[in-house]
Amino acid sequence: MTENLISSTIDSLDNQSPDRGKTALVLGGGGARGYAHLGIAQVLRDAGIEPDLVVGTSMGSVIGAAVANRADLDGMVKVLTRLDVNQILKISQESRRELEKAIGRSLVREFGVRRRLRGETNDPPVKLARLFTFFKLMTKNSSFSELPIEYAAVATDLETGTEVIINEGKVYEATAASSAIPGFIPPVKLNGKLLIDGGVVDTVPIL
């Protein structure tokens, strides 16, 4: 079924006129399930179809950054398919999604939890420095202005609970902010805001 859907999408794009406007690849969250984005992106690339814009949230922002940077998707597939974050954390897809939403709603109301995530109390299990190092390597430490394909990441403002679109500055910071799972990864301070996983407010971003 997925193969038929991808095939139909490719045929539809091939048949569109040159003045169709911009084509956007929108990648949502979903933890380990987000790895499927890599396969779709690779199929589109193999078909010679490149989006004008890539938008991602949570795991989708990680894959989206790679697509926008024209990274080696085959190499990423080999690395990421060996990892299953949800399995390691013993959290099902449904539970993780509900947990993110519940924690996210709580975070924007409870100042004490915000203090904890700022690092004023116990540290979350994932160190931000390690995440930054990984995303720096993955994105070649690129700035948004250096990307060959236009890209935007979606994050959540910890203070207000509102959606934040990031499309300037360093790509690794935006990707880290968009995928900062509440309670597991510290929020990312960017442009004066504390940002967490974009999936809290928008699982599939539409700009």
Model segments located where?
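Patatin-like phospholipase
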Residues: 1-57, 65-207
